[in-house]
């Protein structure tokens, strides 16, 4: 598999100027920068067989700027192979854009790792057919394509079994800010789940704002035209020189650092800083060990010591506290909340609702909720699941939430046949002793009598569609569960 994650693509295009020596100079410059920043990087070439690519009547047409540019920088197959070897020798991935079918064959012959589809070729179906049969990972730009055209391309590559990534791109050279439309990156990510999305840029080489926004929007591949200027070579106004490339990557790395993790990370320094501003709980009068502490017994003041009960903790809904020691008047209280069933259930419900909101699973208010806890509510996070009952007639539909690390014990049904449809996350379902690894979008049929258990490492939400559900139709293979009253291992809620 290709490593598309945080891949920087240095597009050489024709900036080699028809010189292998200068092309290698560009490769070495990019290799040094990639090594400096320890990044996943590639150099991209362009292959065209100009003897057939350009119509014979136009080979001497000086008005067609692209034709004269291609002819003046032409390299033969052997010269391109030298560049490919130099790319690999510098620890970089070789990528190439073919503009005709013969060039696809040459890419395979040169053992280039990734094929890149140019925006202008993204609807060239004869070329796309050839590329899809090359057996190489593909990255495609989408400049100038409508969403429907991108849908067609993604569908084609998917059905061809091609490993691929999609790059947002604007085919204007250079691209002004107002044309970039980087919001579209988010739409591509939502529209094609599981597909790596990136950005191929042609903006001013000194414009570092664009890479920052692209990464913030979710791009994971970044492409720019690069070159090395000399006394006789001047780069075009959308190609980066090595100094600009260095600045570009530094900006990308800083952006990644600023973005951090998608999970909330509270550092010790942040917690300490906030604690210094909180109010602590202090005894208004002497309090004896074993007393239930009421609001009349305490007052709030700062500073609050490390581990001391805060005003927010004391005033939380249904929070109760019992003195674990004797307290003198004005002494700070160090206690933990007496957690009741309400607090445990609320935590479970809030976690499940958050998982569903993040997954985009929207439910109505007309439903019931079951907490299935086979060994008690205290062990819910280890064993069980949360079930949302939507309808139960001749057909039945439920939404089932499996928490990270949670296991649902093995059972089978005699009357009910069911189908699991994974909506979010991943699930390992064990069917009659065999593991099935399921991801988002997968469907699993469980027939009557099939023993099944499931678990999830990262958490999972799936839809269960079945025949009518009967409460006495779940048969557990663990005797300690089978002997329980079915309602003893359930907590029923009217709604979220």
What do the PLM-derived regions correspond to, one by one?
Residues 341-396, 481-496:
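A short, N-terminal "cap"/entry segment at the start of jelly-roll beta-barrel domains
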Residues 403-404, 414-432:
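Glycine- and acidic-residue-biased ligand/ion/polar-headgroup-sensing regions
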Residues 381-384, 396-414:
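Conserved short histidine dyad/triad with adjacent acidic residue
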Residues 433-451:
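Short acidic-glycine-tyrosine-enriched beta hairpin
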Residues 457-496:
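Double-stranded beta-helix
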């Amino acid at each position: 598999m290709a490593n598309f994650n945080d891949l920087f693509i240095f597009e050489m295009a024709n900036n080699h100027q028809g010189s292998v020596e200068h092309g290698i100079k560009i490769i070495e410059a990019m290799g040094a920068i990639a090594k400096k920043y320890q990044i996943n990087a590639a150099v991209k070439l362009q292959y065209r067989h100009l003897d057939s690519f350009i119509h014979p009547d136009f080979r001497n047409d000086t008005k067609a700027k692209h034709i004269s540019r291609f002819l003046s920088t032409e390299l033969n197959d052997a010269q391109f192979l030298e560049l490919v070897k130099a790319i690999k020798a510098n620890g970089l991935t070789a990528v190439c854009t073919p503009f005709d079918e013969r060039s696809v064959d040459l890419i395979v012959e040169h053992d280039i790792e990734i094929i890149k589809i140019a925006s202008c070729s993204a609807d060239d179906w004869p070329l796309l057919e050839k590329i899809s049969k090359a057996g190489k990972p593909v990255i495609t730009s989408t400049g100038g394509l409508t969403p429907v055209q991108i849908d067609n391309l993604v569908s084609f590559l998917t059905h061809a079994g091609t490993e691929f990534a999609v790059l947002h791109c604007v085919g204007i050279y250079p691209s002004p800010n107002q044309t970039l439309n980087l919001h579209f990156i988010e739409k591509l990510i939502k529209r094609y789940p599981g597909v790596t999305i990136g950005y191929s840029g042609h903006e001013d080489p000194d414009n570092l704002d664009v890479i920052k926004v692209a990464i913030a929007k979710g791009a994971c591949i970044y492409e720019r035209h690069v070159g090395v200027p000399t006394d006789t070579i001047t780069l075009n106004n959308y190609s980066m020189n090595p100094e600009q490339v260095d600045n570009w990557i530094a900006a990308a790395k800083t952006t990644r650092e600023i973005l951090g993790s998608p999970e909330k990370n509270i550092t010790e320094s942040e917690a300490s800083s906030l604690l210094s501003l909180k109010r602590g709980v202090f005894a208004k009068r002497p309090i004896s060990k074993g007393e239930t502490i009421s609001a009349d017994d305490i007052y709030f003041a700062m500073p609050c010591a490390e581990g001391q009960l805060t005003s927010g903790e004391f005033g939380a809904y249904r929070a109760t506290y019992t003195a674990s020691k004797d307290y003198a008047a004005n002494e700070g209280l160090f206690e933990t909340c007496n957690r009741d069933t309400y607090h445990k259930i609320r935590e479970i419900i809030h976690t499940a609702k958050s998982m569903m909101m993040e997954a985009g699973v929207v439910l109505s208010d007309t439903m019931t909720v079951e907490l299935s806890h086979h060994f008690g509510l205290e062990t819910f996070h280890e064993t069980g699941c949360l079930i949302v009952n939507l309808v139960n007639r001749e057909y039945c539909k439920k939404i089932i939430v499996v928490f990270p690390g949670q296991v649902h014990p093995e059972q089978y049904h005699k009357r009910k046949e069911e189908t699991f449809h994974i909506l979010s996350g991943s699930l390992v379902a064990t069917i009659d002793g065999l593991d099935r690894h399921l991801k988002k979008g997968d469907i699993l049929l469980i027939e009557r009598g099939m023993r099944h258990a499931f678990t999830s490492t990262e958490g999972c939400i799936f839809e269960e569609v079945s025949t009518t559900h009967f409460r006495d139709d779940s048969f557990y293979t663990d005797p300690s569960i089978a002997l329980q009253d079915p309602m003893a291992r359930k907590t029923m809620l009217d709604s979220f």
